[in-house]
């Protein structure tokens, strides 16, 4: 049986009509040098700054140095399988992270991938990790309080929503504890928290996650972690990933608290990358743009106006000092970028004053306008009194014949120090802080022995909860101080039942 020529030609025509010429064009370069998490590639002439590049083994990289003949790439993953001569391909995408509600309650790495073993995260949106900060006209001045639940902070260095408040101090002085207590205190405050751990031990991060879970705070918290064992590029990217997640919520009109723990390690990781990329070193071998690294990150924290639904990001960056030296390079940089700093001192910490906040060196440049009226009234002079007490205390060590006024100031100062002490993971609601600070500043604690102050406080606040809730409710609802008569009546009544130690 013969095949007709027409049939053959119609079959060929049919095949030609169905043929789709799919030609995939991608720009490919060649790795010419590799080592220490950095690759140098030739041939990617049109690569963009910060573009994602894909190596032949599937590992991603990020274009950092764009030079005439080659591109310096930081590798975002294991680099041991990449060799000279391997292909590296442009993706045309800028580095992005997944964002959205689905991340809440999860622990992720700086690329947004889950590391808590609880399955994949099905997000639908992503945001670029680098985006310009909002301009002047999109912002609003800080005016709403962010209650940390820590008496020493809410009274002396108040923080407002949209503020950047640096927490600075040596290692092991309770910086992380301040942040965790602040996160725990946001329960019921309609606040989303993001904790970014940079270069921490994995065991430490695990401890933080367990603390948050135990107190139910993981229900409104995202943990972003780049552990000490991970490559430097991930440590450098972690804060940017965290703030991109925060911006998504801010643009929906929500309030976000983001903690960077800590930026000294991010600066070290960036220094490592820059030196490996052969960028010229500056002071303390940091690259020239290390200030810009932190300023562009922290400027993304803002309080937005009505046009952007009044959302806010409040940032608590940490910086670790060496032997209390706050005049080093990174500390002075971040102090000049932020709206104030809380200085934690190891001497105070070791002498049992915890949180170890140095009232003299700590300052909040914009938080005063966000403080509630009740707190303003009771804590107005507290800062100055405490600073004066520290001065008098060192002076009083040398002389015994002090006049009555000086002695009274010293006694009041000792009680102030006791009242500002606080246990770990026990944040205090603002109405209770106001009650105990009222008792202190109005002289109601002057006849209580110093060693009984802590016990007096806990018993008095429990007693108020049961017997005089009107005082607490008034502050909670109106943000104003309850009438003096109510406080005096409550204190007088309670003091009759309080047993002083001998």
Swiss-Prot record:
It is a peripheral membrane protein. Pfam families: ATP-synt_ab (PF00006), ATP-synt_ab_C (PF00306), ATP-synt_ab_N (PF02874). PROSITE patterns: ATPASE_ALPHA_BETA (PS00152). One of its GO terms (cellular component) is proton-transporting ATP synthase complex. InterPro entries: ATP_synth_asu-like_sf (IPR023366), ATP_synth_asu_C (IPR000793), ATP_synth_asu_C_sf (IPR038376), ATP_synth_F1_a_nt-bd_dom (IPR033732), ATP_synth_F1_asu (IPR005294), ATPase_a/bsu_AS (IPR020003), ATPase_F1/V1/A1_a/bsu_N (IPR004100), ATPase_F1/V1/A1_a/bsu_N_sf (IPR036121). ATP binds at residues 169-176. The record marks 362 as: Required for activity. One of its GO terms (molecular function) is ATP binding. Produces ATP from ADP in the presence of a proton gradient across the membrane. The alpha chain is a regulatory subunit. HAMAP family: ATP_synth_alpha_bact. This is ATP synthase subunit alpha. It comes from Lysinibacillus sphaericus (strain C3-41). The lineage of its organism: Bacteria, Bacillati, Bacillota, Bacilli, Bacillales. The gene is atpA.
